[in-house]
């Protein structure tokens, strides 16, 4: 049931999503199957519209945002494009509560690119890395720091202004993974100014898989030489003199061969929907429902691992279930009642969004109370 949908940290729903997605894919099929030469014009225009929507979300300038398959591929594209001195012999800083896929990537690249991966650990028994611990580890030896704006396992939100200010004083490149709050909490790549940002179109944006994005600040674009390059990396893709390659002056240098367009095209209706919304109202709705979930957790004596202060959390509420309530079983039982949630270990993840209602939230709470009493 849509009113008991709590998976905005995962996929995301909005009214008429099924109909919009069906229409978008049918229109693509009609264009791509037509016996004329209009296919690429149609597909690339949709991709450009997708990028424009993301630029508005990020307050990013023209020529600074491009598509990627996912967050990990966007991050790899950026890392592999940096000048050698940016990473070689230096440290790359990341928190232990980052998206694990990004950590897997960094661990695999460290030896090849000559940097030392420094992972800021969790304190004993903690669910997220404390800002002060991350700042203490951020010394002038750090060539690049990847900030996780909101953690996927706790919904802890960092003090981005303080982090970026400190990073600037250390002379580091600063990137931000905004995946877990993009589209819900306002984000501006220029305030505070970061060197790059990565995200997906899933979750609060309600898009489809494969529709990742990469933002790179103009100054860093100028210094970057992306490793995978191809005809779309050029200012003029139809410059086919094989001895005269030159990177495009803007984010297009991060494109390479013929670009994939279907994920962007399929996600565009969701981004169009999002652009029409009152964004303050979307956040206020989430805050009302998350406040109720936090109060209910206290009533049920379920440990809250998400920070209580609104300024220190994203849009999710995450609870640590006791061993008497195996999380996987709880998720399955809730699913049987038409309530959509998920878990990581014994952490139950709850993210109410536009389709979730207060009545649906009360339904979830009652179900959890009943399951708790039966345990």
What are the residue ranges of the model-derived segments?
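Pyridoxal 5′-phosphate
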Residues: 1-375
């Amino acid at each position: 049931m849509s009113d008991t949908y709590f998976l905005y940290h995962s996929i995301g729903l909005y009214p008429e999503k099924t109909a919009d997605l069906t229409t978008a894919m049918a229109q693509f099929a009609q264009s791509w199957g037509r016996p004329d030469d209009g296919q690429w014009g149609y597909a690339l225009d949709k991709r450009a519209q997708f990028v424009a929507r993301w630029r508005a979300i990020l307050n990013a300038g023209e020529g600074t945002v491009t598509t990627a398959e996912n967050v990990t591929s966007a991050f790899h594209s950026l890392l592999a494009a940096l000048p050698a001195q940016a990473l070689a012999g230096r440290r790359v800083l990341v928190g232990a509560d980052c998206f694990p896929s990004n950590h897997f990537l960094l661990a695999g690249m460290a030896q090849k690119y000559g940097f030392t991966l420094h992972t800021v650990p969790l304190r004993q028994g903690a669910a997220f890395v404390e800002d002060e611990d991350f700042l203490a580890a951020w010394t002038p030896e750090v060539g690049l720091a990847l900030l996780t704006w909101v953690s996927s396992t706790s919904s802890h939100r960092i003090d981005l202004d303080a982090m970026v200010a400190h990073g600037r004083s250390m002379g580091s490149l600063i990137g931000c993974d905004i995946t877990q709050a993009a589209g819900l909490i306002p984000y501006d790549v220029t305030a505070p100014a970061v060197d790059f940002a990565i995200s997906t179109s899933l979750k609060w944006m309600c898009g489809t898989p494969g529709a990742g994005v990469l933002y790179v600040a103009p100054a860093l674009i100028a210094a970057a030489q992306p490793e995978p390059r191809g005809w779309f990396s050029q200012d003029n893709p139809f410059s086919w003199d094989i001895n005269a390659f030159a990177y495009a002056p803007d984010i297009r240098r991060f494109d390479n061969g013929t670009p994939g367009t279907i994920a962007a095209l399929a996600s565009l209706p969701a981004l169009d929907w999002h652009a029409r919304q009152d964004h303050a109202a979307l956040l206020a709705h989430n805050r009302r429902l998350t406040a109720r979930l936090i109060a209910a957790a206290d009533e049920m004596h379920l440990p809250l691992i998400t920070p209580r202060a609104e300024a220190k959390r994203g849009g999710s509420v995450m609870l640590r279930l006791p061993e008497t309530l195996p999380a996987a079983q709880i998720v399955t039982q809730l699913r049987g009642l038409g309530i959509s949630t998920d878990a990581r270990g014994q952490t139950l993840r709850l993210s109410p969004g536009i389709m979730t209602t207060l009545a649906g939230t009360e339904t979830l709470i009652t179900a959890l109370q009943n399951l708790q009493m039966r345990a």
